[in-house]
Amino acid sequence: MKKKGGRKIVGFMVKEEKEENRGSVEFQVFSFTNKIRRLASHLELHKKDFSSERGLRILLGKRRRLLAYLAKKNRVRYKKLISQLNIREQ
């Protein structure tokens, strides 16, 4: 750790680059899909949890917009992602 102006600066360890790029559209859609599946199973047990239902709708909209973007930009990657995640086409 180094000190600069009385503050501590923590050096971060550089990890090897993973194959996944967390900023990529595919990773974001994958992440949203996992959250959607968790929320859907939660809502099966807790039918009156309306705040979680709203969160689910927001996530569905975000995923739908990302999938529309990917379909417009690169149809091959879109088809591959849809088949991997077992979700319907828009």
Swiss-Prot record:
One of its GO terms (cellular component) is ribonucleoprotein complex. GO terms for biological process: translation. The keyword Plastid applies. CDD domains: Ribosomal_S15p_S13e (cd00353). GO terms for molecular function: structural constituent of ribosome. It comes from the Eukaryota. The keyword Ribosomal protein applies. Keywords: Chloroplast, Plastid, Ribonucleoprotein, Ribosomal protein. Its main location: plastid. SMART domains: Ribosomal_S15. PROSITE patterns: RIBOSOMAL_S15. It is found in: Plastid, Chloroplast. Part of the 30S ribosomal subunit. Belongs to the universal ribosomal protein uS15 family. This is Small ribosomal subunit protein uS15c. It comes from Agrostis stolonifera. The lineage of its organism: Eukaryota, Viridiplantae, Streptophyta, Embryophyta, Tracheophyta. The gene is rps15-A.
